[in-house]
């Protein structure tokens, strides 16, 4: 196989607009032949996909897939440029195939390498640096080994680099590029979420044998209690003494006091002048009676 230089890859990219990795693969498949590489890219539908990669994708479709039994579910958003393509049956089929792909890939967490956080990449790099396979090797060799191992590890986490479940000869990324060339618009997998029934819930471990034994023992105890209740003689309770009936004397009803009519105030109170005259007249009258009584005696 002829050596593929970066200059040759760049030249093929400028001619076709395909991605760098696609151009490199095309040159490898064609043994460095430029025309054969262009033909290979056109057959794969990748020659024009790279030119559309920078276009804005604001339309598209959000679709779902529920696996048989309802234990795995997927939500995915795939974008395109126009609603015309979004309503296309081929585009809808593509989105549904991508959702099924996600359901079949439990280790996939990201769409592409660009979506992986830098902290996560550095963590994986440190793990790769601690490998025993690097011991005794020159630093430059170690760096190459780490770079290759890191790329492989990270790609296993990305959806675009997984073999397509319906055709293992191509990746999901190549599948998308084929539809870009066929539908004439840029297509991008934006995001997805995979759901697994019971994921993250701590399940209580139970011993089936112990559980059955406990249930059997409880049933026996209940049966023994019921049998004992049936054979025991009925309890005769003593009659309660009758409550003494006491005749209560009727409470006499209070008798209202007879009201005496009050003297009219007008008879008791007279004019000041009249009061003094009356008093004097009464005195004279009584005095006259006394003198007559003395004469009789």
From Swiss-Prot:
Cellular compartment(s): Cytoplasm
Molecular function in Gene Ontology: translation elongation factor activity
Spans annotated as Involved in Mg(2+) ion dislocation from EF-Tu: 82-85
Gene3D superfamilies attached to this UniProt entry: 1.10.286.20, DNA helicase RuvA subunit, C-terminal domain, Elongation factor Ts, dimerisation domain
Start-end of Basic residues biased regions: 286-297
Disordered: annotated segments: 223-297
GO cellular component assignments: cytoplasm
Main localization, broad class: cytoplasm
UniProt superkingdom: Bacteria
CDD domains: UBA_EF-Ts
Biased composition (Low complexity): 223-265
Alphabetized UniProt keyword annotations: Cytoplasm, Elongation factor, Protein biosynthesis
Keyword Electron transport among record annotations: no
Entries under NCBIfam families matching the protein: tsf
Function of the molecule: Associates with the EF-Tu.GDP complex and induces the exchange of GDP to GTP. It remains bound to the aminoacyl-tRNA.EF-Tu.GTP complex up to the GTP hydrolysis stage on the ribosome.
UniProt family annotation: Belongs to the EF-Ts family.
UniProt protein name: Elongation factor Ts
Lineage: Bacteria, Bacillati, Cyanobacteriota, Cyanophyceae, Acaryochloridales
């Amino acid at each position: 196989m002829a050596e593929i230089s970066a200059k040759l890859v760049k030249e093929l990219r400028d001619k076709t607009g395909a991605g760098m990795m696609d151009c490199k693969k095309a040159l490898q498949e064609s043994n460095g032949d430029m025309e054969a590489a262009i033909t290979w890219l056109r057959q794969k539908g990748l020659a024009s996909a790279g030119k559309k990669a920078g276009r804005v994708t604001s339309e598209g479709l959000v679709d779902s897939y529920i696996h048989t039994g309802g234990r795995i579910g997927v939500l995915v958003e795939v974008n395109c440029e126009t609603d015309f393509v979004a309503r296309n049956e081929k585009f809808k089929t593509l989105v549904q195939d991508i959702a099924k792909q996600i359901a079949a890939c439990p280790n996939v967490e990201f769409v592409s390498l660009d979506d992986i956080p830098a902290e996560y990449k550095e963590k994986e790099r440190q793990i790769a640096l601690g490998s025993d396979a690097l011991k005794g090797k020159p630093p430059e060799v170690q760096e190459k080994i780490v770079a290759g191992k890191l790329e492989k590890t990270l790609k296993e986490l990305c959806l675009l680099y997984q073999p397509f479940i319906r055709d293992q000869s191509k990746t999901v990324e190549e599948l998308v590029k084929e539809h870009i060339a066929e539908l004439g618009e840029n297509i991008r997998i934006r995001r997805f979420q995979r759901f697994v029934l019971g994921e993250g819930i701590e399940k209580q471990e139970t011993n089936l044998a112990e559980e059955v034994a406990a249930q059997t023992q409880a049933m026996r105890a209940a049966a023994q209690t019921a049998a004992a209740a049936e054979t025991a003689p009925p309890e005769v309770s003593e009659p309660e003494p009758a409550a003494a009936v006491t005749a209560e004397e009727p409470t006499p009803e209070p008798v209202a006091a007879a009201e005496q009519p009050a003297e009219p105030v007008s008879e008791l109170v007279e004019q000041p002048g009249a009061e003094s005259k009356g008093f004097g007249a009464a005195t004279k009258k009584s005095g006259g009676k006394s003198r007559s009584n003395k004469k009789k005696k």
